[in-house]
Amino acid sequence: MGEENQPNYTISQENWSLHRKGYDDQQRHQEKVQEAIKNNLPDLVTEESIVMSNGKDVVKIPIRSLDEYKIRYNYDKNKHVGQGNGDSKVGDVVARDGSGGQKQKGPGKGQGAGDAAGEDYYEAEVSILELEQAFFKELELPNLKRKEMDENRIEHVEFNDIRKTGLWGNIDKKRTMISAYKRNAMRGKASFHPIHQEDLKFRTWNEVLKPDSKAVVLAMMDTSGSMGIWEKYMARSFFFWMTRFLRTKYETVDIEFIAHHTEAKVVPEEEFFSKGESGGTICSSVYKKALELIDNKYSPDRYNIYPFHFSDGDNLTSDNARCVKLVEELMKKCNMFGYGEVNQYNRHSTLMSAYKNIKDENFRYYILKQKADVFHAMKSFFREESGEKMA
């Protein structure tokens, strides 16, 4: 074979699966991180360091380390064919210790000193963005409707086209190789080499204009003297995540913050999350303020309206009937009304007793008794609807 006919490439015959070990380990690590986020999410969402942060911090969560393959001494000295029932996963501990059937103290968890090895854990840093992705993926504004007077449009970029020219960073390797295989196969060559210019395929984006309805969320919080430090923290934790959820998933959602004791007033967001007040409780005042806002600023013909009220349920008894009437009036103009009650010790609530008589399906309530209930309240209020979504 002449020098000019010598191939300018070689094909390696080594085991390429060995080169993927680092990638496989990285994938296993990411799976463990996502599993840890999912398992710890109800507790993580109420971490004070997150709720009181600027939204850019990271948190640390414990993750079980993966056991690498190792040779262990066979204490039982028995012959074995295999292990397990087929449910084992990479990294699971499969060896037995040399107890000889005797009872052991265990790995040192709880009281007393154990004598067995424990599970290795390490702390992984997780950004709030990763928490949001895990938390918000199954949440949506319920009963979102198209409004007749709505003319909003959202520009959305979608990679939905394949072209023969484009940026090298957007080259579609799979389609390029398939194209080369087809061309070479027609010439009797069972390979994708060489790749010609005509084989190149590039992913290309198009700008898509999607109609989008306006929505407004009325965040109403009881700041009276009966709302202690823990109650206010729970309410603010809910509204913290609600605000981030709305601003992450929806581009045209307004949020109005209303604080109340015996009187209600619209306050800036920073004051809503930081300022404490005292005094008695007349919840009807905040519903009147909400109706006033709707009448003056947010017409139901143009806006999807979602009021959310958080309180400890300790309302002036004579005001409860008025509250029920105003809530029913609000629901005629709103897509959904959400009431969250922070009631750690399961005490009698005059307000909840009145609200339980409301039978409207668009009225949702949730009683929060522990920190993890902030997560469950979000899932309850913003759960995905089984019916048709807004077109």
From Swiss-Prot:
Top-rank lineage group of the source organism: Bacteria
Stretches with biased composition (Polar residues): 1-16
Entries under Pfam families matching the protein: DUF444 (PF04285)
UniProt biased composition (Gly residues): 98-115
Signal peptide: none
UniProt xrefs under InterPro entries: Spore_YhbH, UPF0229
Region (Disordered) residue spans: 1-31, 80-117
Biased composition (Basic and acidic residues): 21-31
PANTHER family noted in UniProt: UPF0229 PROTEIN YEAH
Family named by the database record: Belongs to the UPF0229 family.
HAMAP family assigned to the protein according to its UniProt record, in alphabetical order: UPF0229
Name of protein: UPF0229 protein BA_0551/GBAA_0551/BAS0519
Organism of this sequence: Bacillus anthracis
